[in-house]
């Protein structure tokens, strides 16, 4: 059985924290916002590079007929590579 084309991306997205967090991929750091809609069947992820101009935006839909990845004005490879390599940073207390 062949895995679903977006199975790795789906698992990586689900593993990321919901809400706003900081993360790193390669030598770049990002502020990331992950929002769930429709009881988690739709995921919106937006990331802005800290101190740079890189930007990531995508929508991911978990449909009955299969998962669908919709990058926003960028390649599917760019958003897939980003999601698969993004490592959230530990949360810092504001105390």
Task: Describe the function of each predicted region.
Residues 17, 75-76, 87:
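Residues that cap or delimit alpha-helices
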Residues 1-33:
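Negatively charged, low-complexity tracts enriched in Asp/Glu with abundant Ser/Thr
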Residues 83-90:
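Long, highly charged low-complexity segments enriched in Glu/Asp and Lys/Arg with interspersed Ser/Thr
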């Amino acid at each position: 059985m062949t895995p679903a084309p977006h199975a790795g991306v789906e698992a990586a997205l689900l593993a990321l924290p919901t809400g706003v967090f900081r993360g790193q991929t390669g030598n770049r750091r990002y502020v990331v916002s992950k929002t769930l809609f429709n009881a988690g069947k739709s995921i919106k992820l937006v990331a802005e590079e800290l101190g740079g101009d890189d930007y990531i935006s995508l929508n991911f839909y978990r449909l009955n007929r299969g998962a669908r990845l919709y990058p926003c004005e960028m390649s599917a490879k760019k958003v897939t590579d980003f999601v698969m390599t993004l490592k959230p940073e530990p949360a810092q207390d504001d105390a």
